[in-house]
């Protein structure tokens, strides 16, 4: 089991320092502490597939948006039924989220969304894009822009292309990548202290 991932460990250290100087409120410090504690309790993955730790990072990172979602929020798991990798990852993610994954003040409830039907997705607060959708990622970009909702994924290439707002990796260390243009299109902005700890494209 790993210790607290470095990005969130650094966030907590920053929060502690700023809290002593009165420059940051207790809520932000509490969020940082919750992230570090939650992720430290998740075992390291034994394979390259999406992991519970990846999902925890995604969920916690959504809490650092300027207008973070709270309460029960449907997260659309976007997948391509004709792609075995995408379909398997969607099934795995649905199982990991179960009846609802709690992260701080947020509980994510999975909703399966076929990529060709993403434009008609109903009450969804965010999208979780699976790997293997390829060029169809452009449909996600269009949906996040029209619906003004964030997209998260472990497929960093989709973030680099602008199809998805945020990508995460939890091993060998936590890394978070945000596409600034995609975030702006989706109406998503992040807390300044969080932005110092991520990579923006």
Which role fits each region the language model picked out?
Residues 2, 8, 43-201:
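Short hydrophobic alpha-helices and adjacent helix-cap/hinge residues
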Residues 30-41:
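Bacterial N-terminal signal peptides
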Residues 1-25:
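N-terminal secretory signal peptides that target proteins for export/translocation
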Residues 13-16, 39, 44:
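Intrinsic disorder/low-complexity segments in short proteins, especially the signal peptide
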């Amino acid at each position: 089991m790993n210790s607290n991932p470095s990005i969130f460990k650094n966030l907590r250290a920053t929060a502690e320092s700023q809290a002593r100087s009165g420059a940051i409120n207790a809520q932000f410090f509490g969020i940082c502490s919750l992230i570090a504690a939650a992720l430290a309790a998740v075992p390291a993955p034994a394979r390259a597939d999406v992991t519970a730790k990846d999902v925890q990072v995604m969920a916690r990172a959504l809490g650092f948006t300027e207008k973070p979602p709270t309460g029960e929020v449907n997260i659309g798991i976007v997948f391509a039924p004709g792609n075995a990798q995408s379909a398997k990852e969607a099934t795995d993610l649905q199982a990991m989220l179960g009846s609802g994954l709690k992260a701080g003040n947020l509980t994510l409830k999975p909703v399966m969304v076929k990529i060709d039907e993403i434009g008609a997705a109903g009450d969804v607060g965010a999208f979780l894009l699976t790997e293997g959708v390829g060029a169809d990622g452009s449909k996600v970009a269009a949906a996040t822009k029209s619906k003004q909702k964030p997209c998260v994924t472990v497929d960093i290439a989709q973030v680099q292309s602008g199809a998805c707002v945020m990508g995460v990796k939890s091993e060998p260390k936590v890394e978070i990548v945000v596409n600034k243009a995609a975030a702006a299109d989706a109406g998503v902005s992040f807390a300044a202290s969080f932005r110092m700890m991520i990579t923006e494209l």
